[in-house]
Amino acid sequence: MRRAPDRPRYDAPVSDVEVAAEPVATPDRRSFVDRVRNARPWLKGLAAFVLYLALTCAIYLPPIGAAIGTRYVGDGWADARLYRWGLAWTPWALLHGHPPLFASDVFAPAGVNLTWVTFVPSLGIVSYPLQRLFGSLVTLNILMLLAPALAAWATYLVCVRATKRFWPSLLGGLFFGFSSYIAGHMVDHLNLVMIFTAPLAVYLVIRRIEGSLSPIWFVVLLTLDLVFAFGVSTELFATTTFFGAIAFVIALIFSGRDVWRVLRAGLLVAASYVMVGVLLLSFLTNALNHEPTQVLRPVDKTSIDLGSWVVPRQHTRIGGESFTNITSRFTASAQEDAGYVGIVALVMLVGFAITEWKRRSTWALLAFLAIVAVLASGSVLHILGRPTIGLPGEWLTHVPLLQHATPQRFPAYAALALGVIAAIWVSRGTGWTAWIRWVVAGLAAAAILPAPDPSAFHAYGQTPAFFTNGEVQQWIKQDEMVFSVTERPASELQWLAASGFWYQIPQAYIGPIPPEYEGQPIYRGLAVNQLNPYIPTPADFAAFLQDHGVTAVLVDDDAVWKFGPVLHAVGLVEQYQGDGVGVWRTGPAGYVAHDPAAVVMNGDIDHVGGELRAFSFPSVDGPERVRGPNHRTTLFSFYGPTCDRSCTANLQALDTWAGAHPDVRVIAVSS
């Protein structure tokens, strides 16, 4: 007797053929849910992406309104300006025959190796048309808004292969695309939020195991995915590879009769990595040869607390600012702590384990989650800030490339597994239990929804017209050595890119300073709003400018009030002022150091002999700066990014007091 063909097992992957074979309701009786359920797979995928993008915009656009061309979606601090330079650098270098991994016009004349600089070459190449059309600020904002949507969408693709259901898969994508990891790094870390390549790699592997993707296409597509990931972030490439290897071992253990299919897919993955090694040989060689001598971030200070999993941080919409008295004890900062999933998510995991305990895939997913949780805790388990038992995370600091990754970011991969678990658990519910599963999973997703960082200023990001209207070519010679004095760190890179890389600079904010420049703060440049403001002595400044052959100094109009005295003190004279920038050069005597006429203290306040002469701060209400003192007594109130709701009460009390004392100028400053 001929056997009927085997039906797919309960947890077998689903092919496009099976998805298309679902029964279709009659057109005249189809509800909206039925129409979505029976739509073509590509149309469902498009709808999912649009919904994720709409949610992203609803969360992150309100703080800046329609000002996507003038303000940053993130806080606009130094990293954002570094990315704007990086996005422009790679296309320019390729088009002009320069090696993209070496910037000769930064830290000139020696130049700087960019292997360990987050200059995001992959994003620079794919976004080149956007940069040409809209400029670097709009391009950066668009990429930042695309990142959560792409991460959620790639996770949706994974969930669809596991469930063949649209709505559960749509829900599953939320857990990764809007996770605490994404929320924290949306403050400015473009290279870290572009993590969609990780779930996309998982999707391709599932397609290969189920047989719906040919070996050749699988190797080609996975190679492209990995190369793109490496060009976005070497850290994400390393952690994706590491946790992918862990997932592969777990899959072999729990795959049962499918072990050979998993093993064959693993061999093809290895072939893809060989292709990646060939394509990126120069990049990888540079990375290993120029690897920092010390771990960039110590493990004991960059791991998560056990409480991180259930206590929300500031970037969480529900309860984010209610527990700062607890989270202030955690080792990870609010921005970097990716651990939060919430108590409801833990309830969902318990329900998943109880109802699906007979399936191998259940224990494979839970085992992966447990391993991520242990490694994210670093070398010591911290409970509400208190160190307890030792953990195996310390050995990661001895693995090349991976040793510079930080455990506090590892929970991103737990969020990916959590999204798949949510989709599977909801899709398998029947009868009244289905509603219970939907409610629990829906509440878990709602609990992690992010809010824009309350401490972010969303700075204005326009480039001075001097660099875009041709003035820079009139006042600065091509390849001239130029020192930049700016209002914010890394603006010197933004200016350089906007000029079309017209001149050279001896200093820059590029993340870690090259080893040969360590210990010399002037190599980070001079900026008004630095975290650790530095003003050199006239003698040191004059020596630096002379030793590096600097013949012109570009000064932001908003930086003159602070650095004007030291510029005059080394013999510089302003020769041009306009379009937001001044051009300063020396007289016939060259650089001659003498005592400045005023003593400038660290920060944004200029003191001379104890008397407040001038101050300048960004205004929340517009691009103008609050200046003074205008011959009035001035009272300053400084508050930091860890403020909780008590800050609001204090500020309201301060506002009431200011209204009763019109003779005193009261200014609240976010530090």
Across the structure, where does each feature detected by a protein language model lie?
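Membrane-interface helix-loop-helix junctions at transmembrane boundaries of multi-pass membrane enzymes
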Residues: A39-R40, S255-L267, L349-G390, G431-I436
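Short active-site neighborhood of thiol/selenol oxidoreductases, capturing the structured segment around
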Residues: R625-A649
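Extracytoplasmic
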Residues: D16, V295-R297, G442-V599
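Structural microenvironment flanking redox-active thiols in thiol-disulfide oxidoreductases
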Residues: C647-S671
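Start-transfer (signal-anchor) and selected internal transmembrane alpha helices
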Residues: M1-P63, A265-V274, I354, R360-F368
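Periplasmic/ER-lumenal interhelical loops and adjacent helix-loop junctions
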Residues: W77-L94, G266, G277-A353, H404-P407, ...
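Membrane-embedded helix bundles of polyisoprenyl
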Residues: Y52, L143-A162, F166-I253, V269-G277, ...
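Membrane-interface coil-to-helix junctions
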Residues: L55-A151, S180-I195, S303-F330, V380-W395, ...
